[in-house]
Amino acid sequence: MKKLLTVVSFFLLGIILSVGCKPAPDPMLDMLDTQMSSLKKDDLTRTMEFVYSENRFDQGQFQDKVSSSLNRWAQVDASEETIDSWTLDSFAKSLIDQYATLPMIERTEEISYLNSDAYYLQETSWMNQLTQRIVATPNPKLFEIYRLAAGDFETEGQEEDLLAAVMKRIHPELDAEQATQLAAAAKVFDWVTRNVQLTELVDLSDEQVEKQRLNPEVADPAASGTPGAGYQHFPWQVLMFSRGDYIERAKTFMVMMKLYGLDSVMLATKSKGEDGEMVETLWCPAVVVGGEYYLFDTRLGLPIPAGTPVKMATLSELKKNPDWLAQLDLTPEESLRDDTKYWVTADQLDDLVGLVYVSPESVAKRFHLLESKLPADQPLNLTSQPSEMIKRLPSKEGLKMKAWNVGFETHAYRQAVNEAVKKANEEDVVRNKLSWYFTNEAYINDFTLYRTARAKYFAGSFETVRGDAKANAIELFYALMYDDDKIRSLGSDQGLQRLLGIYEEDSSLLEFRQRIESVQAQMSLVRRDAGYFLAECHVDNGNVGTAINWLDRLRATPGDNRWEGGVNYLLGRCHEARKEYETAIGIYENDQKSPQFHGNVIRARMLGQLTGSEVSAEAAPEIKPAPSDN
């Protein structure tokens, strides 16, 4: 199947590059623009309507529309505005200086907007809406392991925040507000763990680096377009693609914590490298609640336990009880793999670094002005003041703070990728280096309906509103599960063509045929993802039984196993939610190929300790890849 996928991807690559024509005007974008004009909305209000809309648009036209509208607003409506209080944050200045040649950074002190600013607005809107939804939704079934740790706490009839009540029992040292905050952090962390399938860190040899480098004239890995750990995707892309390494999970979680109102830092350990220089290794996010740093390991997919199952460790407690880290090693009975040791040791706790996430947009003058002028019914937390946050952070012995450059690295990397994509049609070497882009991203960027379904999922659009003809997320993902007949019919089905943004009258016959072939190739990739996202919808909507049916179906369907780790983990979580503990434990322990295997085994261990469950042969079926069709 992997061979087949490669063929499809390179076919798609060739079609996309050969079409070469300017896309037809996005009718949905034009319709919304016309509607806003008729209502005499000002440029800023109209811009935010585009950003907040659940409907997604042609990517290029969306960013052009948003940036041009913002610049028009800045020149006309905001031309007399001043923000004398703005100064470049002192804590971020070193990063601004380091990346001064990036177009994004060159405008830090200007009131003018770039095309890429549209995606930052979209990212903040999505993550703000998503964070509020996650925190507000009880969904107690998903936190069964916490309920068990709270002494088999009975949640029926509870009117308060159920997880906050559970947290108060597990952590009696917290007051009610702190328990609510820790519960919110746990909910968001759990959502990120379930919805961002963990991928392995990119670890290239020197030879591989030279082969992957998109711009051989640039030495910096990110700026040269060389894939690397943590910086390949913006947080909004991590959400859209539903995949990321543990660093990308971490920064996504930390941005959501900021939007909720909690401070966090990324902890890093220090050790000597082969050349004798000190090397920092990223570890885990630490969220501040009640003056303490609570540790959430995005590689494990679990908070660091405080010696007993599920109870969350603080950094202060861990330093007093460093043996807790050794309890995260896997035993020979649990795994015979070589990498059974936990990746942080007790001696590393004495010299930690706290990295403060900073995005270049959040400290820019233009976004400070924009945030202050947003309509009252369209507020967004677009800015940050890292130097003020540093003052708020608890002072702990041995923890030194510094600005984290990963947000700047992502901009540098994506600039290199975007420039390379423009050259791919003419340069075979560049085109071959970008095969990952056309396999994993291009079809999503070009498929508006796919992105609309994802946006509706982030918003929690699961129910059909009476009298509203708009499809919800579940209905859209169903619609995206195209069968072979539907894909073949695209060439003659004008209704489907228009739904997917194909208009014969706007192109030559050759361009039209190439566009049909391109979208047909995309449809075969889209349906692979839609089934998995449909299961995610049902889990978020509390229908774990329905989710199990879909996940079992996905495991039995021939495919390239792109979502294998996520499917198995989500399936285990669903059985855990239904109190089918032995089945859940068996799934966690047997998914040997998952990058999250270590954490899944720790989860299985804790679940077994809390329930006294043992895995039977029937309850722990071997996890096998979906059958191949080649």
Where are these regions (language model features)?
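Solenoid-like repeat scaffolds
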Residues: 516-525, 552-562, 589-597
